[in-house]
A protein has these predicted regions:
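Amphipathic alpha-helical "coupling" segments that flank catalytic cores
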Residues: 1-622
């Protein structure tokens, strides 16, 4: 199982579990149920008083908050995202004496700066929200504020003749910025609608924290919704102030857009010489040259239009030196598409320029077009190979170049878009482009890069609910073609519930142990004349017959069918172990039987190393 290896020694998983419990593996108990045998630890933990627990709990919670930048205030040494002026810690009606961030706990809170009482005494912990709302004009509950904002902005969108687009991240941000939300509808100059929609939305959403509104066709309307922290007595002035700020920002966006349109993307390629990709790997212009070569190579393998892919690769980074992307970095690729369309580039080229950044994160959409997929693969493989060459592989939780995300993107594209390419070949092709530029990639760097990409399978498929032993079993059989890996893994996950799967897994585990412990090497070919026992003759014949039977299924990647055929070997395998002694004194006979077992193991390894499947069952025999 996962807790002990074949020699009965505890695995790192078992020792780690014991260490986390503060005991040794020997002190753990064994629990057996219908799902197998488990290691467990039981301990009696005495209760503790709330007042002794609350302060360390508060400190722990504060430390775990994802705050990238902390600040200090006053003369104290406490650090937090913003200055902290009071702390309320109550258990029922009683103040729990403790301290956090240099502040002693009490029962005095504060209301809304403009709409509530300056000092509010909280009599009872259960009255906290009600008291703050009544006396302080503060809606303390985050979810309540969020729902209120959503209702308000939705109503205003309808009032404007459209529908408010509620971005969840923006909703969370605005909810955290206000205590008493009050939404206001504003307008901007319709002339700005000539600027790319994404830039207008970015100005509203990312820069101003405004919600935008679309019509029934999904077109942007020249209105916005801001959420104020007060109900102003002069809402017109508040609205006018927000309109003035937004119109100024949109005017900047229009200026950059009109300026960028004066130069075609093709004229910007040389500017990439001035943009560093990596100190050891050259500029973005150098990367562009490599992408052109690699994209063509991938296009040839997939038998798709090389010219379109090469053109998209030539232009794909040029929008990075435009004013629009300088102002809106999050729109890289999108601005490239707009500018390519303006330059009358082929539609497929414009689309690929935008799509080659997909997926941007784990759950993002994938490139929909073939040139987009080709370029997305080339871009990520080039970065992976180059940065491993430069010694920038991720360590621990540090991944400054996003290589885990890049590797996962490669795997997702190949699997979900059913692109049957080999990772090893992609890495080798990319390494060739570096070598052609005078920067050869060593064998070790390539090996590390390939292993790194394949290791992404674990996180991806574990998140999809596949067991680690299933993933390990397929990885052991080879996983350089992600689409093929996906098909084999799904077939194996179903096969493990087959009535003969457990017995075959146990038999394969025994075969693996025998082969590993054997001191002599296995012969390249089986010698039929040395097959003397009827059980080993039957096994040899069954292996030959099964190999021929599964070959067509494997050729068409029908792994469920191949595994069903392999399952038919169980009776002859069980008989072999019941009737045949492998490790006999006769060396030629022993070598021949080891060779026979090697052939059997290799037959299963065309799909997976099923000996790695965890099962309590063991084969009988000698």
């Amino acid at each position: 199982g996962a807790a002990f290896d074949d020699q009965g020694q505890p695995t790192p998983a078992a020792t780690g579990f014991a260490r986390s419990c503060g005991v040794t593996v020997d002190q753990l108990e064994r629990l057996e149920n219908d799902k197998g045998q488990w290691l467990v630890h039981r301990a009696l933990v005495p209760g503790a008083l709330a007042r002794s627990l609350i302060e360390p709990c508060i400190h722990s919670a504060i430390e775990k908050l994802p705050i990238p930048k902390r600040m200090r205030w006053g003369e104290g040494l406490a650090e937090f995202v913003r200055p902290v002026h009071w702390l309320v810690v109550l258990h029922g009606q009683r103040v729990l004496p403790c301290e956090a961030l240099g502040i002693a706990a009490g029962r005095i809170s504060r209301g809304h700066r403009f709409m509530g009482e300056a000092r509010i005494s909280i009599r009872n912990a259960g009255d906290y929200e009600k008291t703050l709302k009544k006396q302080g004009a503060v809606i303390a509950d985050f979810n309540t504020r969020s729902r209120l904002i959503e209702q308000q902005v939705s109503r205003l969108g309808i009032k404007a003749g459209g529908k408010t687009v509620i971005d969840p991240q923006l909703l969370d941000t605005v909810t955290a910025l206000v205590e008493k939300p009050h939404a206001l509808l504003g307008q901007f100059d319709p002339a700005f609608l000539k600027v790319p929609t994404e830039a207008l939305i970015s100005s509203m959403r990312d820069h101003q924290k405004y919600f935008h509104v679309i019509d029934t066709r999904g077109k942007l309307l020249p209105v916005f919704i801001t959420v104020s922290n007060i109900r102003s007595t002069a809402p017109g002035r508040v609205r006018a102030g927000n309109e003035r700020v937004l119109n100024a920002r949109l005017a900047d966006a229009r200026f950059f857009w009109e300026t960028d349109n004066r130069r075609p993307l093709d004229n910007r390629v040389d500017e990439l010489d001035g943009v560093l990709f990596h100190q050891a790997l050259g500029s973005l212009h150098d990367k562009t040259r490599r992408l052109e070569t690699l994209s063509v190579k991938i296009a040839q393998t997939l038998r798709v239009d090389e010219t379109l892919c090469a053109r998209a690769a030539h232009l794909c980074k040029t929008d990075l030196v435009t004013g629009m992307v300088g102002e809106f970095p999050e729109l890289q690729g999108t601005m490239g598409r707009y500018l390519a369309q303006h330059d009358k580039e082929p539609a497929a080229v414009a689309r690929a320029i935008e799509e080659h950044y997909l997926p941007r994160h784990a759950r993002d959409k994938l490139p929909a077009s073939t040139p987009g997929r080709v370029l997305a693969l080339a871009d990520r493989i080039d970065s992976l190979v180059g940065l491993f060459l430069a010694g920038e592989e991720p360590t621990g939780d540090k991944d400054p170049y996003g290589l885990r995300r890049a590797a996962l993107g490669v795997i997702r594209i190949l699997i979900e878009k059913k692109v049957d390419l080999d990772i090893v070949e992609l890495v080798n092709h990319s390494a060739d482009t570096y070598a052609a530029a005078g920067n050869p990639v060593g064998a070790n760097a390539k090996k590390q890069c390939i292993a790194f990409v394949m290791e992404r399978y674990r996180a991806l498929y574990a998140a999809l609910g596949f067991a680690q032993d299933e993933i390990s079993a397929v990885l052991e059989a080879g996983a350089s073609r992600p689409l093929d890996f996906d098909r084999r893994l799904k077939a194996l996950a179903k096969f493990r519930h087959h009535r003969d799967a457990a017995s075959l897994a146990a038999a394969n585990k025994r075969i693996r142990n025998i082969l590993r412990k054997s001191e002599q090497s296995i012969a390249k070919e089986l010698k039929p004349q040395l097959l003397i026992e009827s059980a080993e003759i039957a096994l040899s014949e069954a292996i030959l017959e099964t190999a021929g039977a599964i070959a067509p299924a494997i050729a068409r990647a029908d792994y469920p069918a191949a595994l069903r055929i392999l399952a038919g070997l169980r009776p002859v395998v069980d008989r072999f172990f019941d009737e045949v002694m492998v490790m006999v004194e006769d060396l030629p006979l022993r070598t021949n039987r080891l060779t026979l077992l090697g052939q059997l193991s290799s037959l299963f390894l065309t799909i997976a190393d099923i000996s790695l499947l965890q099962t309590p069952e063991r084969p009988s025999g000698r």
